[in-house]
């Protein structure tokens, strides 16, 4: 069964200010999930840049996927998940290990 964690992130970095607000991301993601009949087990919101590793909400999501609570991530755009090689590598590793089976983006 596909079980998704919805992840919305808005950076505090000035270069990333043009990205949709958290509320706008959530609205689009909820609509996408509803339209595609996706099972969302939780919604996680993070307000931090992804240029450096160590985001607490992202790391907790990774742990939950490793613990088989979910096997999919729903995010507004791939750059909401990772903008550094360590976090990107964690996503790739989970895909390789088949802990993470689904990455969905409405854009």
Predicted regions and their residues:
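Short, structured surface patches at the beginning of a domain
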Residues: 1-107
């Amino acid at each position: 069964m596909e079980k998704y964690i919805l992840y919305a992130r808005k950076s505090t970095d000035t270069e990333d200010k043009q990205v949709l607000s958290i509320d706008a991301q959530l609205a689009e993601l909820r609509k996408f999930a509803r339209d595609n009949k996706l099972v969302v087990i939780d919604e996680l919101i993070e307000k931090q840049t992804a240029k450096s590793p160590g985001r607490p909400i992202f790391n907790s999501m990774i742990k939950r996927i490793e613990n088989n609570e979910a096997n999919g991530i729903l995010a507004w755009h791939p750059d909401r998940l990772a903008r550094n090689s360590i976090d990107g590598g964690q996503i790739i590793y989970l895909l390789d290990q088949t802990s993470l089976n689904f990455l969905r983006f409405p854009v």
